[in-house]
Every structure is written in C-alpha cells, then in structure tokens.
UniProtKB/Swiss-Prot annotation:
Protein's UniProt name: Flagellar P-ring protein
Taxonomic lineage from the root: Bacteria, Pseudomonadati, Aquificota, Aquificia, Aquificales
GO biological process: bacterial-type flagellum-dependent cell motility
Chain's role: Assembles around the rod to form the L-ring and probably protects the motor/basal body from shearing forces during rotation.
Signal peptide, first to last residue: 1-18
Length: 363
C-alpha cells in the first residue's frame, strides 16, 4: 500500500479588530533592496542520481575543479553519476557586510534525477556587475525526497532537483551605497493605498513635523534632517506604529517544493462559484433559508441566505460544506486527496473569476 500524501495546510487566524504594526512592516525603503547573485557549481555525494555522461559541462567542470586541487584528469574519464551541475542563486540584502551568512537556492541544470542529500562544493556568486560578492557551500536540503512502499517501490514527493542551503553563503564584498550623502528617502508601500500612505505621513509628522509628504498611493517622501544621525532617524521612523485593520488584503502562500499552503482562516468566497478542474467539480452557491414562526405566535416569516459548498470527484464522491469560507473548501479538497498543484490551480481559477479576494503567492 502506498502511503497517502496529504496537503500540508497552515491556517492563520485573522482578527477583525484594529491592531498596531510598525511602519517597517508596511513599506520598503527605496534603494535599500536586495540584489540578485548567481553562480554555477557542482553538487557531489549523490546516490547514483547525478548527471549522465551526455552532460559534458559537468564532466569538464569536475575535471577543472580537480585540476585546481592539483589532480589532472581527462574529462572523458570522469563519471558523474554521483555529481550534478547546478545553478546557485541568492539575495544579497542591503548593507550586508563581509562575513554575513545568507541563504542560497540550488537547482539542477542537467539531467540529474535528484540532488537529495548532496553537498555543494564552494561556488562563487556573482552580482550584475560581474564581481564576486559571496561564496556558497554546504549540504543541500530539498524538502522533498521519496516515500517508499512495503513492496520496495517508491514515489517522488516535491521537487528533489532543487533545494536550499540555509546560511549557505558567506558575504565577501559589500555593495557600494553612500547613505550618509542622501538628503531624502522614499518609502514604498507594499500594498498601495492613499489612506494608508496618509496615515504613515501623519504618524511621522507627529514626531518630526513637516518631514514627510505623500507623493502617490505607493510612495512617501521623507526628508532626512541634517542635525540628526541619519541611520538613527530612519530606524526611529520605521519603528513608529500605525493601526492596521481587517481591510488588509489576505494572502495565500503556496510552497511548490513542499506542497505547503499558508492562508488566513477567514478568507471568504463570493457566491455563486462553479469550477471544473479535471475530475473535480466545485460549486459554491447561496440558497434561501425560510424561518417560519409557529401559528398565532405573532412572529414574522424571515428569509435568509445559506451557503452550500460542494466538492465532487468523478468517481461520485461528494462533500458538502455549509460555508463559503476558503478554509472549509481547502479542507474538503484535502479530504478528497487533491494534490497541492490541483488545489492551487483551483484557487487561482476562483480568483481569476473575481470570487476570491486574496493575494496568491507561489514560491
């Protein structure tokens, strides 16, 4: 019997009352952005699942790597079943200093079956200007792998040809950035809103009058005072608190490699909705509910709207939910054994129809 793989779902409960958040949670500081780093490397230590001999760049790369270590070998004599050529990427955060550790992502570019439990050999990471800004090395965590049956078979889970190395790169060079010469900074809102931008400006100007002004729903200009340490000033305004409420857009995050779905538990679906995806049919619709008072009670008949969600598989199994909450729909789909990829495709279809008011991020 195969082991059943369920979708890992995390529901984060949202509250409708106002709460306070720091300005830094609502904005980006323009210019203070991460920079993409890219490199080419070799993952070794694979269990016979590496690149084949047709991937000549892997053969040549291994021969060149050994040559640097004083070992000279003809690339034609190299066997690559325990090694794989990979692309290595990372985000270099603003103000990163030499010696700082950053996360890296690793992905196979050859015909390797997987890079599970592999070790990335020291790889230089280059910036857009061609300079080396970091070196990456370490064991690769794929978050996938295989599930085995009691008959010796196995089924793939996740994406074993890509993975991450937490804190896997050491910064060697910092980005040139002269913050002290700046006279103003721009705060860019993560979720553009005139009201949110004005609220942020009001909070800043309450502490430092006249320094902040709204430019548009996305950006706020803040003048840097000449009589105060600029780093200290920016840290202070980013730590100021503003109120946030239920009007914030809910977010659904889907991690492809692990099949994990993270969402707000109170996201509602507008009705009616009808979705057909492969062998799965989803309906979310309103039905009238009549409340009839007893005879001679003096009460009045009241008609309200109930919501019914049905999830049906081609085989004939139907699950009904008396709710239009996204969390209930996802649980019903999970009960049917729907894969994470079918799940996110259904949610994207509902959003495209304008019935799901949430941001969907696939990572």
């Amino acid at each position: 019997m195969w082991k059943k793989v369920l979708i890992a779902i995390v529901f984060i409960t949202s509250f409708s009352f106002a709460a306070e958040v720091k300005i830094r949670d609502e904005v980006y500081v323009e210019g203070f952005r991460p920079n993409y780093l890219t490199g080419y490397g070799i993952v070794v230590g694979l269990n016979g699942t590496g690149d084949g001999t047709t991937s000549r760049y892997t053969l040549i790369s291994i021969a060149n790597m050994l040559r640097k270590l004083g070992i000279y070998i003809d690339p034609a004599q190299v066997r690559t079943k325990n090694a794989a050529a990979v692309m290595v990427t990372a985000n270099l955060p603003p103000f990163a200093k030499p010696g700082m550790a950053i996360d890296v992502q690793v992905a196979s570019i050859g015909d390797a079956k997987d890079i599970v439990n592999g070790l990335l050999i020291r790889t230089p990471l280059y910036g857009p200007d061609g300079k080396i800004y970091a070196f990456a090395q370490g064991p690769v965590s794929t978050g996938g792998g295989f599930l085995e049956s009691n008959k010796g078979g196995k089924v793939q889970k996740g994406f074993p040809t890509a993975g991450i190395i937490p804190n896997g790169a050491i910064v060697e060079e910092e980005l040139p950035f002269d913050f002290n010469s700046m006279t103003e900074v721009t705060l860019s809102l993560k979720n553009p809103s005139f009201s949110k931008a004005q609220e942020i400006v009001n909070v800043i100007n309450q502490k430092y009058p006249g320094l902040a002004v709204v430019q548009d729903p996305t950006s706020i200009k803040v003048r840097l005072p000449q009589t105060k340490n600029k780093t200290e000033f920016l840290a202070e305004i980013l730590d100021l608190k503003i109120k946030t409420d239920k009007d914030n857009i809910p977010t659904i995050v889907f991690y492809e490699k692990t099949g994990t779905v993270i969402m707000s538990g109170d996201v509602a679906i507008d009705t009616p909705v009808y979705v057909s995806h492969g062998s799965i049919y989803v309906t979310v619709e309103k039905t009238p509910v009549i409340s009839q008072p007893p005879p001679l009670s003096g009460g009045q008949t009241v008609v309200t709207e109930g919501v019914t969600t049905k999830v049906q598989e081609e085989k004939g199994r139907i699950i009904s939910i008396e709710s239009a909450k996204l969390s209930d729909l996802v649980k019903a789909l999970n009960d049917l054994g729907v894969s994470p990829y079918d799940l996110i495709a259904i949610l994207q279809a509902i959003k495209a129809a304008g019935k799901l008011h949430a941001e969907i991020k696939v990572m």
